[in-house]
C-alpha cells in the first residue's frame, strides 16, 4: 500500500451501498449447496453460515477490530434471515499465557457488547480445545506429519532460509513417529525446560512460502494459564489453534485481514490433513481475507499503543485520544456511529487509507439526530446589560432539539450579568465580523441577538491593567425578545449564545484533537513518537446552562455553535460535570 495514496473522503457524509466481496462468496456457496443441511460432529443440525470474531486477549480492542466485529456479526445477522440461518461465534484465542490477561479478556467482551452485538450462548475460548488440540497433534505425529525438533530457536530460524534460499531440514526431522510421540508426551509431562523442544509440522523446507517450511505448532512454556492454571506446560501456536478451532466450531467462512493471506495455505494444510485422517468431514472451513482498516492520524499496533501507555504519552488505554474502543467510547463516539462508519467504508481486498473525517462525520450524523441541544460558554467573557435591573429575571426557553418539539424545552433566565464567548467580541472588528464590537468614531456599537433572548447593542468595554478585555457593556431592547411579536422589528446579522452568570454551572471541558500531526505517523522509517501532537488535549474552565448540572456519565449533547460533547465516563459527576469534545460541528482539522 502506498503511503502517498490519498485517503477517501468521498463517502464522509453520504450513505452509500458498501462494497462487500465476501457476500458474493457466501451467496455463491449457498447457491452451490456447499453448506446446506450441515451437522456438527455430534450429528446435530447447525446453521448454514457460521462466522466468528476471535481476538487474542493480549490487549484492548481498537477501531480496526470494530471493522471485523461489524463485518462478522453483520454477515451473520443478514444471513440469519435466509434458509439455513446463520450465527457469529465469539471466541477468545487465549493460547499464549505469557501475554494474555483476564483484564483484556473482560474488556474485549465488554467492547463487543457495547458495539451492540450478542453472541448468545456461543462464547468460546481456544483454551477450551487444549485437550482436542493435543489429541490432534498426536494424530499428526502418528501419521508422520509432525515431529519433535530439538534445535535451538536460533537454529530453527536460521535453517528456515529466506525468500531467495530454501531452508534446511532439521537433523531431527527423520525421527520415527514412536520417538516423536514419546518426546511429545514427555514435553506435556513437564520433563523439559522452556525452549528445549518444539513440535513442528512436516511439510516442505523448500516451499516458496516460508510459512510452510515446517512451522512450529507447539512449544514448552512453564507458565500458568489464566483459565487452565498449571494443567499445561506446552501450548499450541496460533496457526495450529486457529484453523482447528474454526473446524471444531463448524465455521463456514473464516474471515481475517490481509496480513494472514500467506498463512492460508497452512490453514488449509492442517484442516485437510486432519480431514484425510478422519478427524473432520466436509465441508471444512476456508479462510478469506479482507483489507484491514487504515485510518489517518492513527496507529493500531498493539505494541506501539502499549508504548504510548507505558511511556505516559497518553493517560491510559481509555484516553479519549486513543483508537481503542474504550478510548473512543470515552471520547464520545456511539456504537451506532461506529457501525455506520464500518458500513460506509465497506469491505475490499485492496489496502487503502480512510480519512479520519469519515469516522467523525458518522458521529455527527448520528448525534445530529439523537443529541439534545445545550448552551456552553467555553471562553467566558462577562457581558453586562446596563439597562436591565440586577434583581430582575426574564424567563427564556429553547427547544431541546429543533426537529423534535415533543422533547420539550430548556428553561433558563435572562439576567443583568451574562457570560458570552470571548470570540464574540472584537475591539476593532475585521471585515465580515457581525458580532459584538464597541462604538467606533461616530458610529454606534454593533447589534446582535442573544439567542432565545433579546437584541442588544454594544456600548463599550472594560480592560485590566494588561489591556485584556474583562467586560463588555450593552443595552437591550425590551420589545425584541425572541418569540414575541416585536422581535421581527429588529434585523441583525449576528446571533450569539449566552448564559446567565447567576445560574451558570462551572464545568471542566476537555478539547481533544488528533494524537498525531502526521496523517501517516507509522509509515516508512518514521518514529511515530516524533509525530505526537503537543496540543492534542486542552483543558478549560467553562460555563454550562442550568439544565446541565445533573448530567450523567456518557450523556451526550450538542453544545450549540461548538460541537458534540459527552459527560466523561470516568470523571464526570452530577453537580461537578466534566465534558469531552467528541467532534466539532464540521471538520476543522488542517
Swiss-Prot record:
It comes from the Bacteria. Its EC number is 6.1.1.18. It is an enzyme of class 6 (ligase). A motif ('HIGH' region) lies at residues 55-65. One of its GO terms (biological process) is glutaminyl-tRNA aminoacylation. Keywords: Aminoacyl-tRNA synthetase, ATP-binding, Cytoplasm, Ligase, Nucleotide-binding, Protein biosynthesis. Pfam families: tRNA-synt_1c, tRNA-synt_1c_C, tRNA-synt_1c_C2. CDD domains: GlnRS_core (cd00807). It catalyses: tRNA(Gln) + L-glutamine + ATP = L-glutaminyl-tRNA(Gln) + AMP + diphosphate. Monomer. This is Glutamine--tRNA ligase. It comes from Polynucleobacter necessarius subsp. necessarius (strain STIR1).
Amino acid at each position: 500500500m502506498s503511503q502517498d495514496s490519498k485517503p477517501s473522503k468521498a463517502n464522509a457524509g453520504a450513505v452509500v451501498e458498501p462494497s462487500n466481496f465476501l457476500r458474493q462468496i457466501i451467496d455463491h456457496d449457498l447457491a452451490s449447496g456447499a453448506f446446506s443441511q450441515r451437522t456438527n460432529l455430534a450429528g446435530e443440525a447447525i446453521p448454514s453460515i457460521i462466522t466468528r470474531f476471535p481476538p487474542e486477549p493480549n490487549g484492548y480492542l481498537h477501531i480496526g477490530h470494530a471493522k471485523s466485529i461489524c463485518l462478522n456479526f453483520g454477515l451473520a445477522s443478514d444471513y440469519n434471515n435466509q434458509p439455513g440461518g446463520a450465527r457469529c461465534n465469539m471466541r477468545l484465542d487465549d493460547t499464549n499465557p505469557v501475554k494474555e490477561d483476564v483484564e483484556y479478556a473482560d474488556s474485549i467482551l465488554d467492547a463487543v457488547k457495547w458495539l451492540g452485538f450478542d453472541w448468545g450462548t456461543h462464547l468460546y475460548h481456544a483454551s477450551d480445545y487444549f485437550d482436542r488440540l493435543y489429541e490432534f497433534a498426536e494424530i499428526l505425529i502418528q501419521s508422520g506429519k509432525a515431529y519433535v525438533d530439538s534445535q535451538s530457536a536460533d537454529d530453527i530460524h536460521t535453517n528456515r532460509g529466506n525468500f531467495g534460499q530454501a531452508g534446511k531440514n532439521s537433523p531431527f526431522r527423520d525421527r520415527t513417529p514412536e520417538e516423536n510421540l514419546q518426546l511429545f508426551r514427555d514435553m506435556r509431562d513437564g520433563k523439559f525446560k522452556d525452549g528445549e523442544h518444539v513440535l513442528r509440522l512436516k511439510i516442505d523446507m523448500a516451499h516458496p512460502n516460508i510459512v510452510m517450511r515446517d512451522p512450529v505448532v507447539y512449544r514448552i512454556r512453564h507458565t500458568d494459564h489464566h483459565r487452565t492454571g498449571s494443567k499445561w506446560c506446552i501450548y499450541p501456536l496460533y496457526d495450529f489453534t486457529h484453523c482447528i478451532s474454526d473446524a471444531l466450531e463448524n465455521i463456514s467462512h473464516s474471515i481475517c485481514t490481509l496480513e494472514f493471506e500467506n498463512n492460508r495455505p497452512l490453514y488449509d494444510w492442517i484442516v485437510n490433513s486432519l480431514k484425510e485422517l478422519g478427524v473432520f468431514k466436509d465441508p471444512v472451513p476456508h479462510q478469506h481475507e479482507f483489507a484491514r482498516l487504515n485510518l489517518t492520524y492513527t496507529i493500531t499496533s498493539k505494541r506501539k499503543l502499549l508504548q504510548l501507555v507505558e511511556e505516559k504519552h497518553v493517560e491510559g488505554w481509555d484516553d479519549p485520544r486513543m483508537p481503542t474502543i474504550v478510548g473512543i467510547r470515552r471520547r464520545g463516539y456511539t456504537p451506532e456511529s461506529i457501525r455506520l462508519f464500518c458500513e460506509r467504508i465497506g469491505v475490499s481486498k485492496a489496502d487503502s487509507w480512510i480519512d479520519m473525517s469519515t469516522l467523525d462525520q458518522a458521529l455527527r450524523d448520528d448525534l445530529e439526530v439523537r443529541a439534545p441541544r445545550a448552551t456552553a460558554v467555553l471562553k467566558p467573557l462577562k457581558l453586562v446589560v446596563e439597562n436591565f435591573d440586577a434583581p430582575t429575571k426574564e424567563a427564556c426557553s429553547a427547544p431541546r432539539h429543533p426537529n423534535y418539539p415533543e422533547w420539550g424545552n430548556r428553561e433558563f433566565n435572562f439576567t443583568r450579568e451574562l457570560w458570552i464567548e470571548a470570540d464574540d467580541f472584537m475591539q476593532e472588528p475585521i471585515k465580515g465580523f457581525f458580532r459584538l464590537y464597541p462604538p467606533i468614531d461616530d458610529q454606534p456599537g454593533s447589534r446582535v441577538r442573544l439567542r432565545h433572548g433579546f437584541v442588544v447593542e454594544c456600548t463599550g468595554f472594560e480592560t485590566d491593567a494588561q489591556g485584556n478585555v474583562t467586560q463588555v457593556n450593552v443595552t437591550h431592547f425590551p420589545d425584541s425578545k425572541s418569540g414575541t411579536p416585536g422581535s421581527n422589528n429588529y434585523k441583525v446579522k449576528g446571533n450569539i449564545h449566552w448564559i446567565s452568570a447567576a445560574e451558570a454551572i462551572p464545568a471542566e471541558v476537555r478539547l481533544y484533537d488528533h494524537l498525531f500531526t502526521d496523517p501517516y505517523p507509522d509509515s516508512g522509517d518514521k518514529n511515530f513518537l516524533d509525530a505526537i501532537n503537543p496540543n492534542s488535549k486542552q483543558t478549560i474552565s467553562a460555563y454550562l446552562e442550568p439544565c446541565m448540572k445533573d448530567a450523567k456519565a456518557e450523556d451526550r449533547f450538542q453544545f450549540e455553535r461548538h460541537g458534540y460533547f459527552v459527560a466523561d465516563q470516568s470523571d464526570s459527576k452530577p453537580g461537578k460535570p466534566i465534558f469531552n469534545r467528541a467532534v466539532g460541528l464540521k471538520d476543522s482539522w488542517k
